[in-house]
C-alpha cells in the first residue's frame, strides 16, 4: 500500500515546474473572530504551486502511515476529508480494509482533478468533490448516515477549523476519530487546537505536534483526557506560513 501511494506521489512530482492553482489558507481574522456553524469562512487566496511543491505538500510517508493506522484500527467505514490537495492523504486513509467510502472535498478544480487521478491508482472507494467546503457539506451531510473518521485539513485558520468541526460534529459516531491537521501551522491554529482539545464532545485528545487526534464520546460535562505526545515525538515549532506574503496568482516553488 505504501509503495503504491508513494509511487503516485512521485508521478505528481514528475510534473516539475508545471503549475497548478491552489487555495492558500488566509491570514487569521479573514472570517471574523468568532466561530459559529452558520457564519461561513472566506475562501483561501489563489496561488500557483509547482507540481513538485504539491507533491511535497501532502502528508509524507510517515504521517500518511499514521493516517492509515488510525483509519484501520478505528475500523472506520465512512470517512470524510476536508482538503484533498493531490489525493495523497485520502489514498492512505481509504487504503484501510474497513473503508467503505471516503468523501474528500477540494476547492481547487485543478487539484480536484489531480486527486482523482491519484486515487484511481489506489482505490475505487474514494470520491472527490470539487467545491468550497461548506457548499460540499451542504450536499453531503444530509445524506451521510454517520461519519466514523473526519480529517479536517485545507483551511488552517482557527475560526474556520472550529466552524467545520461544528458542522460535522452532529454526524460523528461515538468512538469516532477526528484528526485536525497542521495544528502548529501558526499561533492562530495552535490556539484553535487548544480550544478544540478541551471540548466535552471528546473523551480523549492527543497532541502529536503536526496533527491533533480526538476521540468522540465525551459526557458533555468534562474536558477530555489530554495526551501531549510532543515530548516523545519531538516538539513541533509554531510555523510562519510563507504564503501569507504572496499576492494572488504568484508562483510558489
Regions found by a protein language model. Name each.
Residues 1-151, 156-179, 183-253:
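A short alpha-helical cap/connector motif
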Amino acid at each position: 500500500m505504501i509503495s503504491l501511494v508513494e509511487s503516485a506521489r512521485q508521478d505528481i512530482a514528475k510534473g516539475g515546474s508545471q503549475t497548478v492553482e491552489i487555495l492558500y489558507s488566509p491570514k487569521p481574522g479573514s472570517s471574523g473572530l468568532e466561530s459559529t456553524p452558520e457564519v461561513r469562512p472566506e475562501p483561501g487566496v489563489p496561488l500557483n504551486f509547482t507540481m513538485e511543491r504539491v507533491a511535497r505538500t501532502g502528508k509524507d510517508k510517515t504521517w500518511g502511515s499514521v493516517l492509515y493506522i488510525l483509519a484501520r484500527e478505528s475500523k472506520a467505514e465512512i470517512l470524510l476529508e476536508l482538503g484533498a490537495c493531490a489525493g495523497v492523504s485520502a489514498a492512505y486513509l481509504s487504503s484501510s480494509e474497513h473503508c467503505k467510502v471516503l468523501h474528500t472535498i477540494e476547492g481547487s478544480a485543478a487539484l480536484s482533478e489531480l486527486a482523482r487521478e491519484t486515487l484511481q491508482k489506489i482505490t475505487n472507494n474514494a470520491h472527490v468533490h470539487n467545491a468550497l467546503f461548506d457548499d460540499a457539506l451542504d450536499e453531503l451531510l444530509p445524506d451521510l448516515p454517520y461519519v466514523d473518521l473526519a480529517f479536517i485539513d485545507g483551511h488552517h485558520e482557527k475560526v474556520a477549523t472550529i466552524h467545520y468541526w461544528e458542522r460535522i460534529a452532529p454526524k460523528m459516531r461515538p468512538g469516532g476519530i477526528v484528526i485536525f491537521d497542521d495544528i502548529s501551522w501558526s499561533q492562530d491554529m495552535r490556539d484553535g487546537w487548544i480550544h478544540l482539545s478541551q471540548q466535552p464532545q471528546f473523551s480523549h485528545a492527543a497532541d502529536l505536534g503536526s496533527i491533533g487526534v480526538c476521540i468522540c464520546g465525551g459526557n458533555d460535562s468534562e474536558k477530555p483526557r489530554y495526551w501531549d505526545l510532543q515530548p516523545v515525538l519531538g516538539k513541533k515549532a509554531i510555523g510562519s506560513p510563507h504564503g501569507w506574503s504572496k499576492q494572488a496568482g504568484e508562483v510558489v516553488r
